[in-house]
Amino acid sequence: MSSEEVRHRAESSEARAAAVSDIQELMRRKEEIEAQIKANYDVLESQKGIGMNEPLVDCEGYPRADVDLYQVRTARHNIICLQNDHKALMKQVEEALHQLHARDKEKQARDMAEAREEAMNRRLASDSPALPKAFARVNSISPGSPASIAGLQVDDEIVEFGSVNTQNFQSLQNVGTVVQHSEGKPLNVMVIRRGEKHQLRLTPTRWAGKGLLGCNITPLQR
């Protein structure tokens, strides 16, 4: 495992730990709000069991004398405000859980890609030691992108990209055409990384960033 991969794994673990901590804090606040709502309902219960909607005037239209009107009004107001806070907080919890699940799914996909890469690399190790010529180099990768999930790294030299190889490569438009026609379909990508061949599976996919890959490549001088 390269130092870049180790760093990326460490950052992912730290990000997940921070997300879990945020969710725990949200749940603590949720319990506090629910306790406050219950306390205010207890106040209403202590006032002749009056609820949120019972009238505060008697049949003749006068303020009821059998309950503490100030306490009732205050408790009702507090309950409404706390219920609004609770609703907003639950939306935050839902979003945080969604992000955590998405992060876990991305990690699982990355781990599977790394396992496939390792297996392919072991098979490639028994092939001819002569390295094929590359036609392009990766100079940037966005975190969480399809390229990142597939295991592509900065400075990887591309030997094959789907049907594009050194023999038929003319310009980056060749790669762009393959990508546009392969959305959602896995492509075989062979790269040279620190003197070794690596076989990857890259699936062009729409994601949060630009394009279908989330990486930038530049052609090599031929």
UniProtKB/Swiss-Prot annotation:
GO terms for cellular component: cytoplasm; nucleus; proteasome regulatory particle, base subcomplex. SUPFAM superfamilies: PDZ domain-like (SSF50156). It holds the Pfam family Nas2_N. GO terms for molecular function: bHLH transcription factor binding; transcription coactivator activity. This is 26S proteasome non-ATPase regulatory subunit 9. One of its GO terms (biological process) is negative regulation of insulin secretion. Acts as a chaperone during the assembly of the 26S proteasome, specifically of the base subcomplex of the PA700/19S regulatory complex (RC). During the base subcomplex assembly is part of an intermediate PSMD9:PSMC6:PSMC3 module, also known as modulator trimer complex; PSMD9 is released during the further base assembly process. PANTHER family: 26S PROTEASOME NON-ATPASE REGULATORY SUBUNIT 9 (PTHR12651:SF1). Interacts with PSMC3. Part of a transient complex (modulator) containing PSMD9, PSMC6 and PSMC3 formed during the assembly of the 26S proteasome. Residues 108-194 form the PDZ domain. Belongs to the proteasome subunit p27 family. Keywords: Chaperone, Phosphoprotein. The modification Phosphoserine is found at residue 128. The gene is Psmd9.
